[in-house]
A protein has these predicted regions:
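Active-site neighborhoods and metal-handling regions in enzymes and metal-associated proteins
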Residues: 1-112
Length: 112
């Protein structure tokens, strides 16, 4: 089992909500392609093997084709979008993450 630990700290109300334009995505089920998706953009997204990726990681590709492909993936329900997390009252949040694998042999830290 893989576990992600993501503590948050804020001087706000302490309730995290999603707000704004998503910059992080996760795509799944792209083996057959997607109508309206650009082949080069889809190939780049496949390289992430279902792991989350940021829009900036596609910066070397044509921006219009990237945006059109992200819209096509979303319409085909093959894209999860992750909007920025903010405190419910708009105050700043500090966030860290640590990922660990818990197996029969023990625990292995996957992040640096």
């Amino acid at each position: 089992m893989v576990v992600a630990i993501e503590p948050f700290a804020t001087d706000g109300v302490g309730r995290v909500v999603e707000r704004g334009v998503a910059e992080v995505f996760r795509a799944d089920g792209l083996a057959a392609g997607v109508p309206g998706g650009d082949p080069a953009v889809l190939a780049a997204i496949r390289e992430f093997n279902g792991l989350p990726f940021a829009r900036r990681q596609l910066a070397g590709l044509d921006r219009g084709r990237v945006e059109a492909t992200l819209r096509a993936l979303s319409a085909a329900r093959k894209l999860a979008a992750y909007p920025p997390l903010v405190d419910a009252d708009g105050r700043r949040i500090a966030q860290a993450e640590h990922t660990v694998y818990v197996g029969s042999e023990g625990v292995e830290v996957l992040t640096n």
